[in-house]
Amino acid sequence: MDMEIIRRWNERVKPEDTVFHLGDFCFKEKDGKDFNYYRKQLNGNIILVRGNHDNNNKSESKINFISINLGGIDWHLEHVPNYSVKFNLCGHVHNLWKIRRNGNQVCYNVGVDVNSFYPIDIHEIMRDLNRKPFIPNPNTNI
């Protein structure tokens, strides 16, 4: 399964892309396969937000969350769902659900478990949320 996830990642992610990985990059070292073993096989610049299983690998990520504007929306990126912010991208819940809404609040699960084991991009997220298409700002690299 590891090789299939790597194949699907590289099918979608170009070397120059930036990917926000929302934690649990790899559960623990097994048979000499650690964070660096997997990382060097993946395209893109990976910004890793710490997950609850990242203590078991060598990622050394110190980032607990990221706030970023994508598609004109201020997103909060964190491993666990955060229901105190308006727009949250998370992982952690595996295949329990993909989108949770509470009034104007949205929690979107970007985990591979609910995305056919592919990384998901902002265009797919916006489409899933039935919002207008995301038009990137030409002054950014997003």
Residue ranges and their predicted role:
Residues K58-T140:
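Conserved beta-sheet core of the metallophosphoesterase superfamily
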Residues M1-S67:
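Core catalytic region of metal-dependent phosphoesterases/phosphodiesterases
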